[in-house]
Swiss-Prot record:
Keywords: Signal
Keyword Transferase: no
GO cellular component: a single term: cell outer membrane
InterPro entries, alphabetized: OMP/PagP_b-brl, OmpA-like_TM_dom
Signal peptide residue numbers: 1-22
Higher taxonomy: Bacteria, Pseudomonadati, Pseudomonadota, Alphaproteobacteria, Rickettsiales
Matches recorded under SUPFAM superfamilies: OMPA-like
Protein name as annotated: Putative adhesin RMA_1308
Domain of life of the native organism: Bacteria
Organism: Rickettsia massiliae (strain Mtu5)
Pfam families: OmpA_membrane
Length: 224
């Protein structure tokens, strides 16, 4: 947690410094909120070898930003996910569970703080098309459960990773000082911690799951 707070303070300082270049310009700050639907990339469960699939999870982001110029803006966002899970039932392919019918589930908890920059690629009368990128710290942990194998379920502790985000979207003004967005984002939050669980006579590796997601979100920006 101390690492996240330190990186958060550094991120805020960098954002503040970058915005100082825009001093004297008639631009505005804004608040934003985004939510939508996301799915994780498929991954293999380390203990059993079962290939896991994602359910549909809900990403939520809150942020504050600044219009640096007519076509450029930057913001600082705090984001998380609601209800995300990688899960699958099938026959294990890894020893010592080979052939055992098992249901494996990985439920992540992800909190990320990102500095994002955006550039309008084209400007039309009704809407703009923009591209963006973000980077910052993420706290990632997961709850791992198994049905069909007793004594293997476990929880991993928080790991601080560097999260990356790429975005392509469109925005439109719906009122004075209010804009809406529709965007696709790819996010890499890194891996959770690995953990060895002692199973009768064997040390079994678990955790170490990589969380990369495809996100489709709608958002709104309010000038302040």
């Amino acid at each position: 947690m101390q690492k996240l707070l330190l990186i958060a303070a550094t991120s805020a300082t960098i954002l503040s410094s970058s915005l100082s270049f825009a001093e004297g310009m008639d631009n505005e700050w804004y608040l934003r909120i985004d939510t939508g639907a996301a799915m994780f990339n498929e991954e293999k469960d380390k203990a059993t070898g079962v290939k896991l699939k994602s359910n549909t999870t809900v990403p939520v982001d809150l942020g504050i930003g600044y219009y640096i110029s007519e076509n450029c803006r930057a913001d600082l966002t705090l984001g998380t996910i609601i209800g995300g899970k990688l899960k699958k039932s099938g026959a294990a392919t890894n020893a010592p569970f080979t052939g055992t019918n098992v249901s494996a589930s990985h439920k992540p908890t992800i909190t990320r703080l990102l500095i994002n920059g955006y550039v309008d690629l084209t400007n039309f009368d009704m809407f703009d098309v923009f591209a963006g990128a973000g980077v910052g710290p993420a706290l990632v942990k997961e709850k791992i459960t198994y049905n069909g194998i007793t004594g293997l379920s476990s929880n991993t502790k928080n790991r601080t990773n560097i999260s990356y985000k790429l975005t392509l979207g469109t925005s439109a003004q719906i009122a004075d000082g209010v804009k809406v967005e529709l965007a696709y984002s790819w996010i890499d939050d890194g891996r959770t911690k690995s953990k060895n669980v002692i199973y009768p006579g064997t040390s079994v590796p678990t955790g170490g799951m990589r969380y990369q997601s495809h996100n489709l979100t709608a958002g709104i920006r309010f000038d302040i």
